[in-house]
From Swiss-Prot:
Domain of life, source organism: Bacteria
The keyword ATP-binding is annotated on this UniProt entry: no
Cofactor: pyridoxal 5'-phosphate
Name the UniProt record assigns to this protein: Glycine dehydrogenase (decarboxylating)
Organism of origin: Burkholderia lata (strain ATCC 17760 / DSM 23089 / LMG 22485 / NCIMB 9086 / R18194 / 383)
Keyword annotations from UniProtKB, A to Z: Oxidoreductase, Pyridoxal phosphate
Residues bearing the modification N6-(pyridoxal phosphate)lysine: K723
Amino acid sequence: MKLEHPDRLMNRTPLSLAALETHDAFAERHIGPDAASQQAMLDTLGFASRAALIDAVIPASIRRAETLPLGPFAQPKSEAEALAALRVLADKNEVFRSYIGQGYHDTHTPAVILRNVLENPAWYTAYTPYQPEISQGRLEALLNFQQMVADLTGLAISNASLLDEATAAAEAMTLLQRTGKPTSNVFYVADDVLPQTLEVIRTRALPVGIEVKTGPAADAAQANAFGVLLQYPGVNGDVRDYRALTEAIHAAGGHVVVAADLLALTVLTPPGDWGADVAIGNTQRFGVPMGFGGPHAAYLAVRDEFKRQMPGRLVGVTVDAQGKPALRLALQTREQHIRREKATSNVCTAQALLAIMASMYAVYHGPHGLKTIALRVNRIAALLAAGVKQLGFATVNDTFFDTLTIDTGARTAQVHEFAKAKRINLRRVSDTQVGVSVDETTTRDDLADLLAVFAQAAGGTAPAVDALDAGLAGVAALPAGLERTSAYLTHHVFNRHHSETEMLRYLRSLSDKDLALDRSMIPLGSCTMKLNATSEMLPVTWPEFGGIHPFAPAEQTVGYREMIDQLEQMLVAATGYAAVSLQPNAGSQGEYAGLLIIHAYHASRGEAHRDVCLIPASAHGTNPASAHMAGMKVVVVACDAQGNVDIADLKAKADEHAKDLAAIMITYPSTHGVFEQNVREICEIVHAHGGQVYVDGANMNAMVGLTAPGQFGGDVSHLNLHKTFCIPHGGGGPGVGPVAVGAHLAKFLPNQRSTGYTREEDGIGAVSAAPYGSASILPISWMYIAMMGAKNLTAATETAILNANYIAKRLAPHYPVLYSGPGGLVAHECILDLRPIKESSGISVDDVAKRLMDYGFHAPTMSFPVPGTLMVEPTESESQEELDRFIAAMIAIRDEIRAVEEGRADREDNPLRHAPHTAAVVTANEWLHAYSREQAAYPVASLGTNKYWPPVGRADNVYGDRNLFCSCVPMSEYA
C-alpha cells in the first residue's frame, strides 16, 4: 500500500485503520526511485510502465506465470513486525555457557569494535578493495591482520583471511600438493585434528586424487606424504612438542601444516620457530561471536618460498604516484578472476569484515593484553584440572592450554545431566570422557559451577576456587621448552591504541579514507551493491544468534533451525528449485558444492566417468576454478558477436564430449548483461547429451519474481546472499553461497557427519566447518524477504532492470553499450565499451576508473567480462538523483577525453592520466599541470558541497608486486 501525502489524507473523512497502515513502508525505503522518478525514467526509455519494459527485456518463454510462492511471507511485514517475528524465533534458542571448544570459543567483543566496525556501514557496506586508492582504511586494517597472524605464527607472510579453519586446511593441502613431493599423493592428518576439519579435507581431496590418511601424529614421518596436518593444541587439549617430528617429516621429503590457536600462540612457541611450512586456523576468539558457526576469519600463513602459491587475497605495500606509501591487493595473478582454472583457489569472497574485527581486537589489547588473556585462560584450565583431580577424576591430557579431556567413566551421562541443569554445554568426547574448553569469558563463578558439576557427579563437595588458586603455584601445564620467548606484535599500531579514545579515533581515521555505500553509489557490475538496511543488520548482534556454539545440542537451537528452514523455503520459491542448503559460506563454495552434487548424481547412475564441464568464454573466473577443484575438465564454449553462447559451438562441443559430458556452467542473465533468448535451448542441448545444467546465480537480482532457473532448465545453482538478498559485502566478505537443486539432486546436498549433522544419507561431504555455514548472518536475508514480500521483491527486480536501462540509455551517446538484447535493452547491468576511446586518445579504462574517484564514485567493474570495458550495475536501491549524478560524472569525463582527442588537452598531462588527485597534491605550493586545480578536484559543481578526497595517489601495481612487502609499514615511511 502506497503511503499517501498527509495533506491529501487530511481531506478524507473518516480514515480507516487499513488506510493508515503502511506494511509496504520498508519497500519504499529499499527501492530508491519513487513513483515519479520511475515514470520519468520510463519516459526516457519510451515505455509507459515497468511491466511494459519487463515484457520487452525478458523472453516470454521463461517468464514466471505465478507470483512468488512465499506462503506466510507473501505479504510484507513492517520493520517492527519483522523484528518482532524474528525475536520470537530467536527466543526459542537457548544460550548456554558452551565449553565444547572444538575450534569455537565464547569471546568478549570490545564495545568500541562492535559499534564502530561491525555496526558501522562505513565498514560493512564497502566492496573488496580492488580499487586501492579509495580503500586505504580497510587495506590497512587487513594489513594489520596479516601482521598479527605472521607475528603470532612465526611465519613470513599471511593472507588477508579465508572462509573458515577447515577450508583453510583444505587450501593448505592443495597448496602443498602443487609445490611438494611429486612422488606422493598422500596427505596425512593427525588423529587429534578437529573432526570438522578432517571432513572438509576429505571432501576437497577426493575429486583431485589426493589420498587422505589419518593416524597418530607420531607416525606422520613414515606416511610417505607430501604434506602433514598437525593440530596445536590438539582437539583433546594436548600440547605436544613437534620439533623432532617436523624435522623427520622434512627429512622424508614432506611439508608440515599446523592448525594453531592464535591465543595459545601468545604463550606457546610458534610453529614457524620449529620449522612448520604453513600455519592455518581461525581468529574467531579474537572478538568475533560464535554465531552458530560463523562467519569468522580463518588465516593461512606460509614460509616465504610459498608466498606466490598462497590462496586468497594478500595486501601488499607499494608507492603512489607521488612516491608515498600506499596499500593494494598484491599478486592478483594468483586469483581466480585472472587465472581461472589455473588459479591457486576458487575463493573470491573471503571474511574481510571479520578479519578486520580480529585485527582490531589485537590492536586494542596489544601484545601485553593478549598475553594476559591467554595466561588467565590457562590458569582457569589449570585450576579446573586440579579441582577435578581432587574429586577423583583423571585428566587424559597432562599438558594443555585451555582444554581438558576428563575421564568420567560410568558417570559421564551424569556429568552432562548436571551440566545441563546449570545451563552448561560440555563436549561429548565419548561414553566415558568429556571435554571442557574454557575461554576469556569464563569467570570465577563459571569455574565454580563447573567444579560443582563434577562434584555432584562424584558425590563430593566442590573445592573452593580461591583455595585451589592459593595452592597451585606456577603450574602452566605447558611442555618444557615450548614456552614462547620470541616477541610479537611489536609494530607501533599494536602498542598505541589501548584507550577507547585512541581506538575510536583510529577506527574513524581508517573509515574516513574509504568509499563505501554510506557515501555514494558503488556501480560494480556483477556485484549487486544494494542497500543493507539497518533493520536487517540489527539481529546479527542479538546474543540469541551470536552466542550459540555450532555444535550445541539441537534442543538449544530450535529457533535457529526454524529460521533456517524458513529461509531455505524462501529461496526455493525464488529459484524454482526443490531444495536448498545454506552450508556453503561463499559463492565460490556454493559453486563447488553444486559441481560435487552433479558428480555424485552421475556416480549414482553408474556414470562417474562424466567429468567434462562446458563453460562459456565469458564466464566468471570462479566457474573454471571451481570446476577444476571438483575434478572436472574445462572445455570452453565460444560466444558470438552479441556476447551470447554460440549455439553451433555448444552443439559441436556437446557432441564431441557426449560420453563424458558432466555439466555446463552458464550465468543468467549472461555476464554480458543480457537475457539470452535461447537459454531453454542451451539447457535442452546439454540434457540431451546426458549433462546437467549449472546456472550461476550471481545475477539473480535480475530474476527474482520474474523468472527462475529451476523453471527454465537449470538443475543446480548457487546464490549470493551477499548480493541479491542484502547481506553486506563487508569489504570482501562475509558472504553466503547457498546451493539450490532440482528434486533429483536433493538427496546429494551436503552433510557434516563428523558433528552429527546428516541431512541426506547420500549427501556429499561437508564444504564448510559448520553445518549451516555462516549462520549468524542468515537473519539479514530472512529480514529482507520478510519485509519485502512477494510483490515488492518482484518490484525490486523490475526497478533494478529499469535503473540499468536508464543509465545505458543516457550514456549510450557518449560510450557505446557493448551488448544488448532486442530493442537495445539490457538486463540489470550494462557494459560500456571504452576500447575506441583508448585508440583515439590513449586514455585507458584504468584512467577513467581513477578519475571517477575525483568525482566521488567507486568505479564500475573494470575489464570484465571484456577487457577495456566498464560494467555498470546500479541495483534497485539507488535513486534517480544518484543515477543522474553518476551519469553527469561519466559525461563530464567523456568531455575531458574529448579534449584530449581534439588536442585541447595533452595526452599525458591531463586530469585523467594523473587521477586521482589527493588534497595534498591539489593544495601543494607547486602546481605544474596544464589543467587547473579546480578541474582536478572540483570538476562538477555538486562536489562543492560533498567532496570525497582519495587519501593516496594512483597506486603503482608493478612496483608492489616486484617489491613484495606484506607487513605493517614503519611510521618513518610516512614522513
